Design a protein with these regions (language model features):
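Domain-scale signature associated with acetyltransferase and cell-envelope carbohydrate enzymes
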Residues: 1-119, 126, 161, 170-213
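Outer-envelope exported proteins of Gram-negative bacteria
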Residues: 64-66, 137, 141-143
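Beta-rich strand-turn-strand
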Residues: 110, 125-138, 146-148
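Short glycine-rich donor-binding/catalytic loop of glycosyltransferases
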Residues: 132, 143-144, 149-150, 161, ...
């Protein structure tokens, strides 16, 4: 509890006086966008950063809890992809007046849902391409274009985005993936903040092992 207030995932503006910083979940209107508690974006309109999410493609954008999405980040969905196994890439079937029925979905470059797990930091002006899966705790460097999956607790940068290093050693990554702090109650997370913000990784390992029993 801070200033007499309890964290509330249904609050839209978590920082008083800053309209360009919002918790995303309570603002969502599109049923094909699913966002977890306390994920925020540095903008006043999250859905304007999701493009080509057409109902006929049936794909979803799924984002976990406690993600941090910087200004200018764009999520490009499957509707942006064009058929590349035919002579022309022009999407006749999507535009009015052209005599073409939609091709079979097996002929379209559909890559499935885009999934961002929990506690992911996406840097400013990055682009997340269709069907990408980004693991828990990953960091996406600013101006990156992410077209392939990102393992948990991995830093990626560039266009196309490439992994530059794991954030922690394998033991700590495995502990964090088992611990799943983001799924715990608000009161428990509050008590865990000294560990979640600690840079003494040996101490963090010891405490998580203790918590896991």
């Amino acid at each position: 509890m801070k200033d007499g207030k309890h964290p509330n995932p249904n609050t839209i503006h978590p920082i008083a006086g800053y309209d360009k910083e919002i918790y995303v979940k309570p603002t969502i209107t599109n049923p094909n966008i699913i966002v977890g508690d306390f994920t925020y974006i540095a903008d006043s309109d999250f859905e304007s950063h999701v493009s080509h999410l057409y109902e006929w493609n049936d794909d979803k954008l799924i984002i976990g809890k406690f993600c941090q999405i910087a200004a200018g980040v764009e999520f490009v969905m499957n509707g942006a992809n064009h058929q590349m196994n035919a002579v022309s890439t022009f999407p006749f079937y999507t535009l009015e007046g052209w005599e073409m029925s939609p091709p079979a979905k097996t002929d379209l470059p559909l890559k499935g849902d885009t999934v961002i797990k929990n506690d992911v930091w996406i840097g400013q002006n990055s682009v997340i391409l269709p069907g990408v899966h980004i693991g828990d705790g990953a960091i996406i460097g600013a101006n990156s274009v992410v077209g392939s999956d990102v393992p948990p607790y991995t830093k990626v940068v560039g266009n196309p985005a490439r992994a530059i290093q794991k954030r922690f050693d394998d033991e700590l990554i495995e502990l964090l993936l088992r611990f799943k702090w983001w799924d715990r109650s608000i009161d428990e997370i509050n008590r865990l903040i000294p560990i979640l913000t600690c840079s003494d990784l040996d101490k963090v390992k010891a405490e998580i092992k203790k918590q896991l029993g």
